[in-house]
């Protein structure tokens, strides 16, 4: 597995998929609830397979399990904790089916997300409870995935706990940080991104990424990380702001940025490549069309010369 990743990185850059959740919103026409993505995973697994396939077709080398919302804490909040194992299995089966149907060597990433919900660094379970919960998720996923993605980590504590648990799998671990909407030098917790990078890399992560942040602050964050991180990446979102979600709203209150179309997103992605990113993809509001444009950067004959001249 290590050789495969090395070959992929040496050839150019690795392409992740885009935002599964917002694609489900657009296609499922399902009633939006705090656990809407889990509802779709349970009720319409065929749609999850379809979206995975579309991202693979667009050029994704890695797809991520669609179990982001299926943490024990989030499920228990709505008295649905008994669905945990079933939802994890639905997500695993959907990803495997999509890879099988496409017949390509696409890798599957397990996901260790924020346990109470995204963008809420002040809502902590405590170190011991967090470790236990991440271990439960890991136990469901590790036999079925090629790597682990600890994503949308909003604080150093959250990032380090998830990374340390993921390292127990023996698989590659990539950790993705989400940054302040106005200053990409800081996590949403207010902690400096360099301190976060140092702490996460000390836990053993083999790549450090910035995710579910605006493209502009993602660029800022990569500027900070570049001198300190050997393998870094980015997958930004297309939201105007995520502040409503900090108040436990549903995603229908979030507004997308119409200017973040596939072409403009690819322009940001090219800038990230020039800063040294080796892993690129998309988060919320970034669909297969955006990923296809990122793939076109890899197909650009001038790409290697651009990097050499930078």
Positions of PLM-derived features:
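Domain-level signal for soluble alpha/beta catalytic cores
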Residues: 1-310
């Amino acid at each position: 597995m290590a050789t495969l990743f090395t070959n992929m990185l040496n050839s150019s850059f690795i392409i992740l998929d885009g935002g599964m959740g917002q694609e489900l919103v657009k296609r499922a026409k399902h009633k939006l609830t705090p656990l809407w993505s889990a509802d779709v995973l349970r009720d319409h697994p065929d749609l999850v397979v379809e979206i995975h396939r579309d991202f693979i077709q667009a050029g994704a080398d890695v797809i991520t399990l669609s179990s982001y919302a299926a943490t024990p804490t989030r499920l228990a909040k709505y008295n649905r904790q008994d669905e945990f194992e079933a939802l994890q299995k639905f997500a695993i089966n959907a990803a495997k089916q999509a890879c099988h149907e496409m017949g390509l060597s696409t890798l599957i990433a397990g996901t260790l997300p924020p346990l109470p919900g995204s963008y809420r660094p002040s809502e902590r379970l405590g170190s011991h409870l967090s470790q236990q919960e991440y271990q439960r998720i890991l136990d469901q996923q590790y036999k079925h995935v090629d790597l682990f993605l600890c994503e949308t980590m909003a604080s150093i504590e959250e990032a380090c706990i998830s990374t340390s648990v993921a390292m127990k799998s023996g698989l590659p671990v990539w950790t993705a940080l989400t940054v302040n909407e106005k200053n990409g030098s800081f996590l949403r917790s207010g902690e400096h991104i360099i301190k976060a990078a140092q702490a996460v890399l000390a836990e053993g992560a083999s790549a450090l990424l910035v995710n579910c942040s605006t493209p502009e602050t993602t660029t800022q964050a990569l500027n900070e990380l570049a001198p300190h991180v050997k393998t870094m990446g980015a997958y930004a979102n297309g939201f105007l702001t995520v502040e409503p979600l900090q108040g436990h709203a549903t995603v229908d209150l979030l507004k997308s940025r119409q200017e973040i179309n596939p072409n403009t997103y690819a322009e940001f992605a090219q800038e990230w490549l020039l800063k040294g990113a080796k892993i690129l993809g998309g988060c919320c509001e970034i669909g297969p069309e955006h990923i296809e444009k990122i793939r076109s950067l890899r197909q650009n004959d001038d790409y290697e010369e651009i990097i050499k001249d930078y």
